[in-house]
């Protein structure tokens, strides 16, 4: 029982690195969102963290997977992916589906997150269009990462440990389902409100 609940040094350092990126992302987002509503400030905090994860962590994963593989690599970020690879071995040996999705995620989702940050800060008219596209891309990425694996019986997934199942697989991946889902809802509500305002304005001018 104690062994299943043990948190080793590799797991500790990986979680510490993720926490550091979260702290930096929140600090950047809250600073960029000064003078805005609490909701918008936390949206910016998430987007800053999101872009850091895409470029720093996933960007490094793509590089390591193209020049070799994570299992044979050294360094802090390689150690993080080795730790995650204990829960999903596809990340250790350059699984072509995972690497293909991650290339798309780094390039497209990372850039969209930066464009969305700019659109929010500068109050651009295309903000919610970009937000919807980014959220759909991230939800698609989660779907294509896990559903093909589940359809063949999840041979690469290790759910024997609470850490691997609930923290690595469910929590960390679930964030990119829950928050994009909430942001899609935010865009829906905002676009619906704008449409109602335009309809009311048109009625007044008739």
Curated annotation (Swiss-Prot):
One of its GO terms (biological process) is sterol metabolic process. Residues 39-184 form the EXPERA domain. The chain crosses the membrane at residues 10-30, 42-62, 101-121, 165-185. It comes from the Eukaryota. It is found in: Endoplasmic reticulum membrane. GO terms for cellular component: endoplasmic reticulum membrane. It is a multi-pass membrane protein. GO terms for molecular function: cholestenol delta-isomerase activity. InterPro entries: EBP (IPR007905), EXPERA (IPR033118). Pfam families: EBP. Belongs to the EBP family. This is Emopamil-binding protein-like.
